[in-house]
UniProtKB/Swiss-Prot annotation:
Misc. comment: Readthrough of the terminator UAG occurs at position 439.
KW Lipid metabolism (keyword) present: no
UniProtKB keywords: Nucleotide-binding, Nucleotidyltransferase, RNA suppression of termination, RNA-directed RNA polymerase, Transferase, Viral RNA replication
Stored Pfam families: RdRP_3 (PF00998)
EC number annotated for this UniProt entry: 2.7.7.48
Catalytic activity: RNA(n) + a ribonucleoside 5'-triphosphate = RNA(n+1) + diphosphate
Family stated for the protein in its record: Belongs to the tombusviridae RNA polymerase family.
Ranges of residues in domain RdRp catalytic: 662-778
Function description: RNA-dependent RNA polymerase that plays an essential role in the virus replication.
InterPro entries attached to this UniProt entry: DNA/RNA_pol_sf, Rev_trsase/Diguanyl_cyclase, RNA-dir_pol_PSvirus, RNA_pol_HCV
Protein known as: RNA-directed RNA polymerase
First-level EC class: transferase
SUPFAM superfamilies documented for this protein: DNA/RNA polymerases
Amino acid sequence: MATLPSIHAFWKLWWPTFSEERKMTVVQALRNGLTRKLFQITQIAQQILRWPPYIRERMTSSLGQSLVKTFQTLLGIRKALSRLCLTRNMNVDIFTMLLIPFKFLSQLCSQIVASANFVIQTFRHGLSRGLCLARCRNPETMRSGWSKHTLQMQNCSSTSPLMTPFQPQIARDLSNPHGLWMSTRNKLTRTGGSAIQQTSRYVRLAVRFSLLAAGAYISCVLARKALKEYVYRWELKSDQELPTREQSQISQVEQAMEQNGAMMVMKLNGPTAPILSLQDCLTKHVLVPEIVDEEGTVTQKEQSTFLIREFGPAVRNLVTLAKLEFGGIPKKTTANELTVWRFLVRKCEHANMNPTDSRTAISMALPYVFMPCRTDVGRASIPLRDESIEICRQYRAQFVEETPLRRVFNNPLSGKAWRNWVRHLGGLDDPALFQELKXGCLEEWLGVQSRRTRARHPKLRSHFKDTRHKTRRVFRIAGLGNLYEFGVHNNSAVNLERGLMERVFYVKDDKGELVSCPEPISGIFWKNLKGFRNSIVHHVGHRHPVSRETFLAYYTGPKRTMYEKAVNSLYEMPVSYDDAKLKTFVKAEKINLTKKADPVPRVIQPRAPRYNVELGRYLRPVEHPIYHAIDKIWGGPTIMKGYSVEQIGRHIENAFRSFTDPVAIGFDASRFDQHVSVEALRWEHSVYSRIYGYPELLTQLLRWQIHNRGTAYASDGAFNYQVDGKRMSGDMNISLGNCILATAITHDFVTKLGIPARLINNGDDNVLICPAVEVGRVRQELYRHWLNYGFEVISEEPVYILEQVEFCQMRPVFDGTQYTMMRDPRTTMSKDAYAVTPFNTPTAARRWMRAVGECGLSLTGGLPVKQEYYTALVKHGLDPKNIKQGKDFDSGLYYLSKLSNRKWQEVQESARYSFWLAFGYTPDEQRALEEYFKSWTPTFEWSTTGILAEIPECLLLKHNPLPPT
């Protein structure tokens, strides 16, 4: 016990006087000393293999004393180093490096005890089984007997507790090892036959190994007993032995961290201090008192702040909250430090803490977030596995074929096997003493089954089968982002029924009840939007439909093949009403399960390709002319169909800068397709009919969209339904029609208000840009105006910064030369790591990675964070071949990427500033994320279906920063 005061005095008195070079010399010497202490355990354990039985007792005593001395020395040094770190005289990186040996002590003890118990039971069972089999001459019987014995030992090892004491009979046998061996040999000799040669080697090994494990077990018990006594005495006498400490903030922090176990001292006796919440550690300080008049009205609000009354518990709470938030001990990187700092700042701001005290407390708490406490070490000693079943059977997993223990049993004459086991027993598997196991990055998740709806509709007939539904799967590349969890809906009867009920027939009101969609005011489309329709027809002019062969030229790949078959069949039989019937299924899309745990499945309702060919001959030729006509009506580019991300960014910039004091108000029509009424469809159809002069075929094709009949099939059920109106998600005019309706209704809105405005539209996504003085009128009247047309819109918060204008989940970011639209990295870093494309093999996964990386890089070259994200996918991927032509790859990312051709380039500082304005990541956080993606090295191995791969990820990937206002 005399080492503690001297060690403390050394750090207290002499350490500040040392030069930096001498400090590093002392640190290196300490490190070497800790390593030598751990190697002493291994060296003594190696002697067990050579010493005769009569000196086992002496060996056990030596090993026990060595363990006790090692624990005592380590605890003393740990205490001194903790004080040193608190006084800020040592770099935290050096301190963390010196703490590595402490992380492994608990695992070392557990392995010694587990090995001892297992080997002792193996010896007893193996001896009895060997005596029985020795009397049997039949080789088949011996082989089956040993197989049963192996199974019995596996079951025994999986249920044995770690700290089971010796049984009396086993203890008596081990107390006289020479007599045990002689009696066993005599028994085997009496059985006779060749069985002696087959079992002698096994029994000899079992006896030798049992003695080894027994010595290790006894030493561990002695060490634990001495450690408990030592810690107990240290707790009672430390205040008397150590110099008097000043009652300062540092001492408060040290006491609080000891109570929480951060000093890794196991407090086995005595009461612990009550754990205070963060608010209990603060005291309120009123800056401006509240003033109330005689009538009780508050004329002046109180202004106050909170000061830290007890720094120790406050810092302890901050450390605990950070570890709970980030799942234990984060890896000490610059990115993680920035993330933890931001988290702690938000906690202090939420508590209305004084800024000066907040900075002091955060500076003290930050190093401890990256240091293991008692509970952290216990968690870290459990090896991370790819599969949850391995975690549940971690004790049994020590005895599979690959473990050092099993290698010794299988190769008893191998010196390498014995050396590896001794190193494993001493906790020296790795020079770093502790590291997380590498796990595969490929995950497979089963499809999502939503809850069954209770709603019923008279026009929907259900037919459920007593069979299982087909399960879809979604795949993920772990390590790229885990802020959001995504899934995919199964094409099951339950999902189909709910999708039809809540996305076709009913909508939810303010109370969450299912009601019918609101109907527009009768005649409002023909009364208010007649001029808008006439303007479109005037700018487009009279047109003629194209031939079927010309229509095929609009498509390539699988879609062209499908429409070619439809064209051939139309020459044999004309289009009919049966071709207009709907074939409904659940869309296989990536759904965000973090934002909404049980979203309503989205259904796709396509008509026959024959119908699409005939209608497409009329609509495809006039689609872009109608877009240009709408642009002329609005006075600038309005419909963002067919533009690249650079062109969209330029159009939004021009629209935003066309006003002196602009404001952008985004609004999204809630379930736009579902709210399209019969009157809205008829008004939209009148636009096409007037352009083509009301041809009979076009009129008939459009009339079939008014009264719809459909069927939906799944392996466990089928549905028949009828519905009037609505926009069917597979129709040829879904995009064109939505753009016409949205721009027309919004144009009527700004005309009635009499305000100058520009609209950015892409169907149901809208951004209205107008002078800031009009924001109140716009937000007040917008919902009411759209409701008159039968639509419900959700208005977003107005933004006054160009980079924060959100359109189609993208924001404009300046790349150094121009503005380009960038998908939100807070969502896409998680979403782009998921795939509905099957990963049948790791090679298929790497081909998919390369395809996504190439598409993403063509959109984000020269932009912060996402450029390195997609570069990492390209770097670790393989040639994608024809993956991009598959139907599973049909997405907005792919279509946008075909319009851009950006390449990798250095990120400009102006781009980092613009990126911060858009998404809230500071330039330092951007660089930290980029460094993470540059150093990301995936292991293409599988985890079990539905089990996380447990890949350690950068904490910034789970960080959702708020952009500046």
